[in-house]
A protein has these predicted regions:
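Conserved AMP-binding/adenylate-forming core of the ANL superfamily
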Residues: 8, 28-82, 99-104, 157-162, ...
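Structural core segment of the AMP-binding/adenylate-forming
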Residues: 54, 59, 86-164, 544-547, ...
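Conserved ATP-binding/catalytic segment of the ANL
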Residues: 406-474, 491
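Conserved AMP-binding/adenylation subdomain of ANL enzymes
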Residues: 213-233, 240-341
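Conserved AMP-binding A3 loop
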Residues: 39-43, 190-216
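Conserved pre-ATP/AMP-binding loop-to-beta segment of ANL
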Residues: 24-27, 167-194, 201, 227-233
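Conserved C-terminal "lid"/linker of ANL adenylate-forming enzymes
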Residues: 472, 497-500, 546-604
């Protein structure tokens, strides 16, 4: 395996088969069954991909047809994705949290002729949509669906399809697939990924093979040159239907010949990390915030010595983040390497090379926290329309947590007159599926208009200010970044989530979700019964949250200060539609629900 390999691959399936030939009987995809991790080897995976690809062609599917894929993260997700592409088809990854309405939009918009779904539970809303979508013809259940045949849909069993093609031998299937993929080029569409819709109905982003290969090439160069390329282990737990995990958690590991473990779920993530001991992790900022809060609470309970060491580690980390490396810090740095930091690293398995944050902006203080604990943090930047990774921090360029690093290999970046970040390169999508008007707005003269505002620092690293569409412009014409203020609010132990508003208004106001664990402790100390709705009506509780807001205001400029706030009825979540699957808040949905309450703050 060499870095030069990535430029020669014509498609993602060719890259996979090359790695499968090199890795042979080495473990590739691992998941837990009956309490034990079980692996599929590279050779076994390649055979199954070929058999399923031929089974899909056997259903009458033709080159370029779309196949929707609805499943939790598991080995079959990867196998299905590769098989769809090996059949000359196009994958349409779909979130397992989608409603019937969401599924219907994607099925009708993509024109998917076939659907692969993992189990009966996920099939319920999906099949209700499929029966209304005239394009859908075939449904394949990875697990038995126990579904009666319908007049418009034909149901198939995953294992049954594999067994049917295995009768002719895996060799015959391999030969057919090899011949077919020889005609698939880097410019051909690999998948249509629907954006999570922070601002409206999801649009289908057409990602071609070259876009993802360009991303894999750039990321592999960073990892190989800055950290060394060895026997890498990835733990996959972000949704594979999101471009970030699809590229960073699936195709990057494939390109590096790595082993992929599939987490059992967020509730078991901590124990899975300790068991799997990953070398690389791809994470979204919200999870880093949660992990930071948990570590701080646990250290707080361990007494004065642990708290003292934590304080010194953070102080040294903050100085180093500002470029101040003091000789006086070396003895304490040495002590921390022998005491606190190894314990923290063990929480992450003990052999992690780097943790990559992406999908949303990372609060610099969170990044500095993990760096202070001896864990290397790399913040990436991108969007589905760009493969999705545009840039990433790396040691060779100097890691600075208020930047998202320099553009990756093969990526051109320039800043427009209004501050918008523009991107050009093979990583840029070919457009939005069946949406030429939106495509023309997004891509002009070959440059992708990202909708993000930022600049390049003296070392060529990208600094993101905010989303162009999210930027608050107050009644005096001043620009305010809501993400900066929200990020500072949610670092307070009293506050779990926040959204600030203030467009065309004299000042900012906030919608706040109190931290549940903190609220339990507060109620116990105040001898109050814990009921969040009741607590939010107590003046003393509100004053405690006010103190947290005021702490943040002390570090903000006049136009950034949050003057008034109100409480949300419940946490923002994927289930209530107020967060995307990558855990970004959906501002338009939150405003729909709480708009009147927010507006009332200006009348108080």
């Amino acid at each position: 395996m060499q870095l030069s390999d990535f430029e020669k691959f014509q498609n993602l399936v060719a890259m996979f088969f090359e790695r499968a030939r090199e890795r042979g009987d080495a473990p590739f995809l691992s998941a837990k069954h009956d309490g034990a991790w079980r692996a599929i080897t590279w050779r076994e995976a390649a055979d199954r991909v070929c058999l399923m690809a031929e089974a899909l062609r056997g259903l009458g599917l033709k080159d370029g047809d779309r196949v929707a894929l609805v499943s939790e993260n598991r080995p079959e997700w990867c196998l299905a994705d590769l098989a769809i592409m090996a059949a000359g088809l196009v994958t349409v990854p779909t979130y397992i949290t989608n409603t019937e309405r969401d599924h219907l939009h994607i099925l009708e918009n993509s024109g998917a002729r076939a659907i692969i779904v993992s189990n009966a539970k996920l099939a319920r809303p999906l099949l209700a949509a499929a029966l209304r979508a005239p394009c859908a013809e075939h449904v394949i259940g990875i697990e038995p669906l126990r579904q009666a045949q319908s007049g418009t849909l034909t149901f198939h069993d995953w294992d049954g399809l594999l067994a049917g093609k295995a009768k002719n031998g895996a060799g015959a299937a391999r030969a057919a697939v090899e011949a077919r993929i020889a005609g698939i080029g880097r410019a051909d569409t690999a998948c249509i990924i629907y954006t999570s819709g922070t601002g409206g109905a999801p649009r289908g982003v057409m990602q071609h093979h070259g876009a993802i290969l360009c991303n894999v090439d750039g990321a592999a160069h960073i990892l190989a040159n800055d950290f060394g390329w060895d026997e890498e282990v990835f733990l996959s737990f972000l949704p594979l239907s999101h471009a970030y995990e699809h590229t960073g958690g699936q195709y990057l590991p494939i390109g590096m010949g790595a082993q992929i473990f599939y987490a059992e779920g967020l509730e078991k993530l901590a124990s899975n990390i300790e068991e799997v001991r990953p070398t690389l992790m791809v994470v979204v900022p919200r999870l880093f915030e949660v992990l930071r809060a948990r570590i701080m609470k646990q250290v707080e309970k361990q007494g004065r010595v642990a708290n003292y060491l934590m304080g010194r580690a953070l102080a040294i980390g903050e100085r180093q983040a500002r470029g101040r490396h003091r000789l006086l810090d070396r003895p304490m740095d040495f002590l921390l390497e022998k005491s606190l930091r190894p314990k923290i690293r063990l929480r992450f398995g003990g052999r992690i090379k780097a943790m990559v944050s992406g999908g949303a902006p990372l609060n610099p203080d969170v990044g500095v926290f993990f760096e202070s604990m001896g864990l290397t943090m790399l913040q990436g930047y991108g969007q589905t329309e760009a493969g999705p990774v545009i840039s990433c921090n790396r040691p060779a360029a100097g890691i600075k947590m208020d930047t998202v690093g320099p553009p990756m290999k093969g990526v051109e970046v320039r800043i427009a007159e209004d501050g918008e970040i523009l991107v050009r390169g093979e990583l840029v999508m070919h457009g939005y599926w069946h949406n030429p008007a939106e495509t023309a707005r997004a891509i002009q003269d070959g440059w992708l208009h990202t909708g993000d505002i930022g600049h390049l620092d003296a070392n060529g690293r990208i600094v993101i200010t905010d989303r162009k569409k999210d930027m608050i412009v107050n009644d005096k014409g001043d620009n305010v970044s809501p993400q900066k203020v929200e990020g500072m609010l949610t670092l307070q132990p009293e506050i779990a989530q926040a959204m600030v508003s203030g467009d065309k208004r004299p000042y900012l106001v906030g919608l706040i979700v109190p931290d549940a664990e903190w609220a339990v402790e507060w109620a116990r100390e105040q001898d109050e019964k814990f009921d969040l709705a009741t607590l939010q009506g107590l003046p003393a509780f509100r004053n405690a949250i006010r103190e947290a807001v005021d702490r943040v205001n002390g570090d903000l400029s006049v136009i950034e200060k949050v003057r008034q706030f109100t409480f949300a009825d419940e946490a923002f979540s994927i289930e209530n539609g107020e967060m995307t699957p990558s855990l970004k808040i959906r501002r338009h949905k939150i405003r729909e629900r709480y708009g009147a309450r927010i507006d009332a703050l200006y009348k108080a």
